[in-house]
């Protein structure tokens, strides 16, 4: 049957599928736009299954704020070429739209309802059919809390700072997190077993070196703190002034409650 070119363009705009695939799907669907979308979706799922084992070492991370909540989506692909492709980039807005239907905060994709996961998986399957590469959802985050979101140029690193103060200060922290990738906010967050392992190691070393028993505990504490300092945000050297620790740049009353860092 003859398919109107305007229908082909509509389907292309909705799915990002190649024009030839759009035309064939419309022919198969007898011009029914919704049915043609479903045909493309099913073909995408079939292609997705064949590509599922291929490694996805490239991708991008995008953020979005709708005035109510902040959204982060990490989407992975096989090559940097596809990461710059309009079809790949268009998936982010579609996934953001799906995430807007979720109530409450989301720390990771494990928190997503099953129906939302299915919708996102269908979008990714369509993306696989369009780009010809394996695509995967690498992470999501949704929050209605006060956060500062920083996207490093190139969209390969994003950091989120949950805070109750000045956004300019939060921005400095977000830059610090993006650059130096700490695991913990403060020494209090370092797991007790990790501390205990180092304490035991340093204690044995100091005893073997003949240090007085009454001095060992204080020396061990200092050595343990120093060992973890590079991995604790508040104890790191401030990237703009190595003579200061991050905690020393925080104004009175400023509080950071937690942070996240996403990277490709």
Regions found by a protein language model. Give the residues of each.
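N-terminal assembly/interaction segments in proteins that build large macromolecular machines
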Residues: 2-264
């Amino acid at each position: 049957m003859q398919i109107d070119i305007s229908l082909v363009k509509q389907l292309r705009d909705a799915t990002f599928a190649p024009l030839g695939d759009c035309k064939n799907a419309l022919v198969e669907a007898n011009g029914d736009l919704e049915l043609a979308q479903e045909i493309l979706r099913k073909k995408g799922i079939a292609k997705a299954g064949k590509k599922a084992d291929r490694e996805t070492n490239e991708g991008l991370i995008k953020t979005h704020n709708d005035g109510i909540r902040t959204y982060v989506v990490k989407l992975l692909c096989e090559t940097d070429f596809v990461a710059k492709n309009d079809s790949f980039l268009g998936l982010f807005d579609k996934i953001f739209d799906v995430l807007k239907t979720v109530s409450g905060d989301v720390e990771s994709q494990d928190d997503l309802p099953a129906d939302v996961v299915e919708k996102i998986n269908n979008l990714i399957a369509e993306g696989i059919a369009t780009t010809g590469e394996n695509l995967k959802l690498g992470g999501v985050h949704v929050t209605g809390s006060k956060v500062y979101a920083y996207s490093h140029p190139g969209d390969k690193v994003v950091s989120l700072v949950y805070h109750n103060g000045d956004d300019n200060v939060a921005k400095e922290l977000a830059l610090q997190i993006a650059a130096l990738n700490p695991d913990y906010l403060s020494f209090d967050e370092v797991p007790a077993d990790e501390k205990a392992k180092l304490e035991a190691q340093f204690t044995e070393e100091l005893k073997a070196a003949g240090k007085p028993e009454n001095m060992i505990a204080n020396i061990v504490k200092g050595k343990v703190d120093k060992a973890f300092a590079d991995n604790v945000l508040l104890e790191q050297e401030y990237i703009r002034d190595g003579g200061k620790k991050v905690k020393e740049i925080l104004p009175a009353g400023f509080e950071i409650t937690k942070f996240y860092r996403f990277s490709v």
